[in-house]
């Protein structure tokens, strides 16, 4: 049994690594802690941890041996602020919010490249904060529903290099960091906070534009994103289990809808429905949507067996791992094709350099192809984790490249 099953999650995060390091260095760690029964009552204990070896200390270490002695002393383990922050990051998966925040900054760069005074900085800050909260809420809701459906519990092949959750959800509930019910409470709280920020944002949009049309557009896009994020794993729709609808939801929510919504939120002018600017904002989101979808897509490979057992029939389960490899290449190629397509549309702007844009796209596409080659080779191996991480890096680099290339005022 893992110690995290019966030890408070905060104690595991804060202390277990140091306990094991001390055992490695000194040959034994001796200390006091407490464990929890299923009913929540404490078991105060003295613990001893020693490293174990294959056949004597001259051979490879095979693990650790722990001895627990129940004691009468009431043990308390102070939890540091840094541990509480790490706990919050683990539960909400904060690092993944770069997938939503960076495309928003790219739209701000687009407006800055067009000229001065074309977007509201206040609206941008409110929009980024609101989307951040909404994204975190969606992450936590997804964990809640995946655990409720038994998907995460059935998954023993997830990737967590260095403790960072890459696939298989946050594992926060499984590690005892938070309970299932508290997960739902956190998700709802984050959602309500995002709606509160949205209220301030809508007021500022009206103050900037003097009209309600952008407010209505931002509201419609925001509700659409909320719908897709919630029902990605929530029943009765559970889009992730509907053979491609989950991937489509991610593409829309982190692509065209995100960039269009950002435009509605920050533009100093009203955006007409189906106007040229409306289509431009949608088009700018297409490559972002594809690259973010590929993050989700490649993360489905290590989880495929457990997902199939629990009815989570996404594209990798539907196609089978071997055939699904080529889906990554298709999505990657569509991302960069749609990006290069934007070259002619953007080339009319003063602070845009077509050569820089095309060369940057070519370099990043080659990086993407190198990731695809790793997927081709390692799709059934633990070494695939490198491709998973690099897919996240690719999406981030692409966003940063867009932020720079859409406003090359210094060239």
Task: Walk through the language-model features, giving the residues of each.
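Short loop/turn elements at sensory-signaling interfaces that couple input to output
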Residues: 47-65
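Solvent-exposed interhelical
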Residues: 141-192, 289-333
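Extended hydrophobic alpha-helices typical of membrane-associated regions
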Residues: 345-410
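PAS-family sensory/regulatory domains
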Residues: 1-10
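PAS/PAS-like sensory domains
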Residues: 11-14, 21-32
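PAS-family sensory domains
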Residues: 34-40, 53
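Intramembrane alpha-helical segments
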Residues: 162-163, 168-271
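Membrane-embedded alpha-helical segments that form the functional core of polytopic membrane enzymes
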Residues: 117-141, 216-230, 274-298
